[in-house]
Amino acid sequence: IKDFFHGLFTWNWSSENWHSTVMAFKIDMGWFQGNFGQILSRFTWELPQTLFGHLGSQTENLFEGVKSVSYYGGATAVETYSAKWGGFTLGSFIIGHRGLHADPNNSLFQHEYGHYLQSRASGPLYLGKYAIPSFYDTMFGRGNHKYHSVEQDANARAIKYFEKRIPGFADRRNKGINEGWDHYNYPI
C-alpha cells in the first residue's frame, strides 16, 4: 500500500518503488513454506513465536529494511540491509544481517535454523525456554554468547539435521571446502 501511494503522489512508478511490497508478499508466503506438518505446526503448536516472527519481519520491511527473502526446509530467511549484527529466529522466521540466505552453507542460516528446530520441538515453550534466555544473554552476557547452552543446543540440532540430509556436511569446511558446518563461528 505504501508503495502504491508513493507512486501515485510522486508519479514515479519504477520497479524500485515496489521492492517493499514484493518483500511483504514474500514474508507472508513464509507462512506456507514447507511440508504439511510444518505449516500445520506454524498455525497451532508454534503460533505465538511465529506471530512475533512475522510481525518483526513485516515491521523491518515497513521501514524498508528488508533486502531479500528466501526459503529452505520450512524456514523463511529475511535478509536486512544492516551489516554484521547477527540474527534471531521466532517460529519459522529468521531475521538476520546482510548476507543471510536460506542456504545450508550460509553460516548464519545454519545456526538460526537450529533455533527454528528448537521452535518446532518445544512449541509454546519456545519463547521462555529458548528465545528469551538467548536474547537476555546477547544483551547482558559476558561476551561468550556462542557458548551459551541455548546456542549450543541450536548448533547441535542444526548440524544433526543437515548431516542427515547432506552426508559429510559436518566435516566439509575442515577439509578446506567452503561449504558445510562453520565450526569456527558456531562451535559444538
Residue ranges and their predicted role:
Residues 113-132:
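Catalytic Zn2+-binding segment of zinc metalloproteases
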